[in-house]
Regions:
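Auxiliary, metal-adjacent structural segments of Zn-dependent hydrolase domains
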Residues: 52-144
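Post-HExxH zinc-binding segment in Zn-dependent metallohydrolases
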Residues: 175, 182-284, 289, 293
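Short, solvent-exposed secondary-structure capping/transition elements
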Residues: 154-156, 171-183
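Juxtamembrane/interface and other helix-to-disorder boundary residues
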Residues: 1-95, 191-202, 254-304
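Active-site recognition of the HExxH zinc-binding catalytic motif
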Residues: 34, 158-174
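Soluble non-cytosolic domains of exported or imported proteins
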Residues: 32, 154-158, 190
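Short pre-active-site segment immediately N-terminal to the catalytic Zn-binding motif
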Residues: 146-162
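Sec-exported extracytoplasmic/periplasmic mature domains
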Residues: 72-76, 168-176, 201, 205
Length: 304
């Protein structure tokens, strides 16, 4: 069955990109430890463009200041702003960027122009021949749309994962900006989509401090966009909350965790659980090694 690039392809997570192509280069940079690696490896250009939609279309451009505010709230070492329609950043001296910041810096500085055409919850997809009937679900690859209502409605992890996903997807596609509205092959969409999923996984690995997190299901249902699993057998889900009433048309991304024992947890609670278990494991290792004290919370305490 042919996959329309406007929609996500569950099989895409199985696609692999060639290790030395543009997409692989982007992913390698996104995995780098900080801004210096990004800056030294790529030409410094401002390549993410925030654009309005065309005349007569449903515009989300009025909410762009909220997008910039949200981006800054999630970027402790960066200051984001628009210069014209280009998204630019300034880094705080001697700061260490988070994984999200590192990925975003790499995307700003890669070679492709990445347009974000800001529509809203009322924007529709289709054509003049058959009509416009399909809502934009987060983003739309072929048209370059970004539903800013969907993006801003997400929780912090959901916002970050959706943003790096579609920007990575677009960055992996040759001459993306010039081809908006044209034809994209299933293979190139699948390649970018797979890299976008990996970019999401990187956000989760950094947040939970767990390198074992891997994708196991792509769009298994209308309200579950991704399912990741770690070596403990716990599942991390990016869920979609479908808006009702005044929020009809808003698809908000949020993240939760379902443990192997089927306990549903918030990301913060689950991260705290992992940290407690790591501390307990450290204490046990030190005890077995004959230590009389160990470090906990930055201070020395007697070993049990």
């Amino acid at each position: 069955m042919h996959v329309r690039p406007e929609h996500e392809a569950p099989a895409a997570s199985r696609e692999r990109a060639a290790p030395l192509d543009r997409a692989g280069r982007i992913l390698s940079l996104q995995r780098s430890a900080g801004n210096r690696a990004v800056m030294s490896a790529l030409r410094i250009d401002r390549k993410i463009e925030v654009r309005d939609v065309g005349r007569g279309e449903q515009s989300g451009f009025a909410r762009v200041p909220e997008f910039i505010e949200r981006l800054n709230g999630l970027s402790p070492s960066l200051n984001w702003k628009l210069e014209g329609r280009e998204l630019v950043f300034e880094q705080t001296p001697d700061s260490t960027p988070t994984n999200f910041e590192t990925q975003m810096m790499a995307l700003v500085n890669q070679e492709n122009v990445l347009p974000m055409r800001m529509t809203n919850r009322h924007g529709l997809l289709g054509d003049k021949a058959s009509g416009f009937h399909d809502s934009v679900d987060g983003d739309a690859f072929t048209s370059g749309y970004v539903d800013i209502d969907d993006l801003l409605a997400g929780d912090d992890l959901g916002f970050q994962m959706l943003l790096v996903h579609f920007l990575t997807e677009r960055a992996a596609t040759s001459n993306y900006a010039r081809r908006i509205g044209g034809n994209f092959s299933e293979a190139e969409f699948n390649r970018g989509h797979s890299l976008g999923i990996e970019a999401e996984a990187e956000i989760l690995r950094a947040f939970f401090g767990d390198p074992s997190i891997r994708i196991v299901a792509d769009s298994p249902s209308v309200t579950v966009r991704r399912v990741f699993r770690n070596s403990r057998g716990d599942r991390i889900r990016r869920r979609i909350r479908l808006g009702r009433g005044e929020e009809t048309g808003v698809n908000a991304s949020s993240v939760d965790v379902v443990t192997a024992g089927n306990i549903v947890m918030t990301p913060d609670d689950y991260r705290a659980l992992l940290e407690r278990e790591r501390t307990a494991a450290q204490v046990e290792r030190e005890r077995l090694g004959g230590a009389t004290e160990h470090r906990e919370g930055g201070r020395s305490v007697p070993a049990p």
